[in-house]
Amino acid sequence: MSHSVEDIKSESRRLRGSLQQSLADAVTGALREDDQTLIKYHGSYQQDDRDIRDERRRQKLEPAYQFMIRTRTPGGVITPTQWLALDGIATRYANHSLRVTTRQAFQFHGVIKRELKATMQAINATLIDTLAACGDVNRNVQVAANPLLSQAHATLYADAARVSEHLLPNTRAYYEIWLDEERVSGSGSEEEPIYGERYLPRKFKIGFAAPPLNDVDVFANDLGFIAILRDGQLLGYNVSIGGGMGASHGDAETWPRVANVIGFVTRDQLLDIATAVVTTQRDFGNRAVRKRARFKYTIDDHGLDTIVAEIARRAGFALQPAQPFAFDHNGDRYGWVEGEDGRWHLTLSLPAGRIADTDTAAHLSGLRAIAQLNVGEFRMTPNQNLVIAGVPASERARVDALVAQYALDAGNRAATALARGAMACVALPTCGLAMAEAERYLPDFSAALQPLLQQHGLADTPIVLRVSGCPNGCSRPYLAEMALVGKAPGRYNLMLGGDRRGQRLNTLYRENITEPEILAALQPLLARYASEGDHANDEGFGDFLHRAGVIALPPYPTHRRLDLELLA
């Protein structure tokens, strides 16, 4: 019997449901219907291989059910030892690949039900878990991966880890089901003072940004903390609320939204303000209409002033006025840079975040070899790339030798700057929501676009490109200068006009078109940008389209420009 998500949560006995019975059922590779919802809170999604779905149906077989498992790794920082362990898990239990997400987590794909528990236990043995990596809770907390600000990054990471731990569910269900923790009778009701018995109305996302870098796309988060640094000292954070990417095609009641900056807090106020924001969404969010349940709609429905006042009431203090800040880009810069502490950091481009050994690349083997050097740490970036961080100068040569041996810098040397900085969600064949290809299509589209860029002398001009298989926007497409959002197999909405700083939403330019139509639409625009753009002042493609009057701000009810007085 199908229940609403709200009913499933409230009747789940703190996220237990019948998961243990579902896992023990050897007749099917699937979970019971309600448990498919609950397992998300444990960090996993039930999926199936859509490439062979029709064939299995013809053979009267159930779908090829499999599970995606996502880690909770705040800020995407792990040790070389942990990297090696995750590599081993991917090889033993998953599809021989690791995938870096846009929220600095890892995803394992292709895990079958009978090996799900063993995989969870192996992940936890690395001192990494998957609790609350999915579901209507706070998800993995993003942290700027800026390798230049060594001390500031350490502080941001520590603050993000504090917030992540503070917002974890209290339930012991995760530990009972996956780690065989015994339930102690009379041990209390596992009260959830932050989440309550129904958790949040919808997923909740938090990001920590460190200007001038906005790699986390902080304005796409439900709650953002923008570090205010003065003379190398972290004074505190500007707070932003109400960002979100998800929307539905053709539904005027849904839209992407950039967050509002509402004030400034000190570090010792972080947990209080995070709790106040999350509980405000818990109590004010729309639980009746799930597509309208994100915090951005809560703000739009009740009014920003009302929500800010409620946050201040719950926190017990009013936010201070926001401090000046400025972002200059939201992408990654590749190659070696020296941090302020004298250690070196190597950023490697990982196309769509996929780490695997293929006929053309040996990323999994190469990064395994680097991890075996046991130097520095591994940082996932919010752009699905990887930083080999904190490498002593004396170890650079050994790292460089392995990078060369395994061609790990092939992505850094892509033919166009656009290809080097592009992002895509997983989409087909595993995502059940995908309407079109994304990760598998990105290399082909980049290659098709490359001649146009080279023809107009734009091969080395950075243009933010993102591809999403559906309008839910996991690759944050609505902030890109150029984005493809899947509408149907081989057909996309072409979105144009975002910026390189993650501060402006793009606009629908052409709807439901094929690759030849996309290229035909882009050809005259790229030609104009090449000849009329203010390249001397580094004018971006999206900025040019607005200045030239090609693109206007999108028609969403809440779209606005950032408060100019905050941009120092």
Swiss-Prot record:
Its cofactor is siroheme; [4Fe-4S] cluster. Siroheme binds at residue 474. One of its GO terms (molecular function) is sulfite reductase (NADPH) activity. InterPro entries: CysI, NiRdtase/SiRdtase_haem-b_fer, Nit/Sulf_reduc_fer-like_dom_sf, NO2/SO3_Rdtase_4Fe4S_dom, NO2/SO3_Rdtase_4Fe4S_prot, NO2/SO3_Rdtase_4Fe4S_sf, NO2/SO3_Rdtase_FeS/sirohaem_BS. It comes from the Bacteria. Its EC number is 1.8.1.2. GO terms for cellular component: sulfite reductase complex (NADPH). Coiled coil: none annotated. Keywords: 4Fe-4S, Amino-acid biosynthesis, Cysteine biosynthesis, Heme, Iron, Iron-sulfur, Metal-binding, NADP, Oxidoreductase. Binds 1 siroheme per subunit. Binds 1 [4Fe-4S] cluster per subunit. GO terms for biological process: cysteine biosynthetic process; hydrogen sulfide biosynthetic process; sulfate assimilation. [4Fe-4S] cluster binds at residues 425, 431, 470, 474. It catalyses: hydrogen sulfide + 3 NADP(+) + 3 H2O = sulfite + 3 NADPH + 4 H(+). It is an enzyme of class 1 (oxidoreductase). Component of the sulfite reductase complex that catalyzes the 6-electron reduction of sulfite to sulfide. This is one of several activities required for the biosynthesis of L-cysteine from sulfate. This is Sulfite reductase [NADPH] hemoprotein beta-component.
